[in-house]
């Protein structure tokens, strides 16, 4: 991709060029941009794009051009067009989505894939990803539409054309490997090597949300070291996802059943990332919209009760949150 320090922005250019994978939402993006005041041109071969842009933009304050890159000839023409685009300082948005998402979207149309009509649908999708990889590398803005509906796509485009930074939707998921890992995880951590509260009878029926279990787990040096490394990686990675205008980042942490260790680490991670969570007084600052999901917590609890019976009655004493400080991890802000 173009260097971020020198890339042109849609907020300062009257023209926006769009390309992307079939099914990623190029047509919908043009429609949404037209509602934002743009004149839209769709399916333009690269060798015609320069002429059309130069002919139309003097009469239109904002112009969005979606390129047709389905044939090898068009992809060869793109290189010459892109040299002109860069010289003009025109931003270039590339739309993509995960292959299985594209498969589901395109299956509803029940027609051959326009990129490689002779191939099976999934095979054609995977081939298009490979064919357009050099095009993707030249974009100034990258948008993954896998989890966007039309309204969310409009919000992302509106933020793009107005130069408004958007919060990254950071989804923190705990899960149990015995039930299956989440298929949409961007970062996945296996913490089954940590001390297992299941083998502590007084902790077995608790969850990673309970302070006694958290205290037991985070008193262990290996847990502390593991958590620090997970926190450091997530803290280092999420700004780059946001800089590339990816709307979502899913971080999954798994243990055996998804009740104890993974839940405790996800809860702690959400707490420690709070200083970067929205709302923020300065919209230009990096910001997160943190969502927590304990994917298999109830499944594990039901299975545990079926095996060992219901949990013992609570002692009736309110549990106090115990937070063991860890070096290299910031303390949460005071409310």
UniProtKB/Swiss-Prot annotation:
One of its GO terms (molecular function) is ATP binding. Keywords: ATP-binding, GTP-binding, Nucleotide-binding. Residues 306-335 are annotated as: Disordered. ATP binds at residues 20-27. Belongs to the RapZ-like family. PANTHER family: RNASE ADAPTER PROTEIN RAPZ. This is Nucleotide-binding protein CYA_0911.
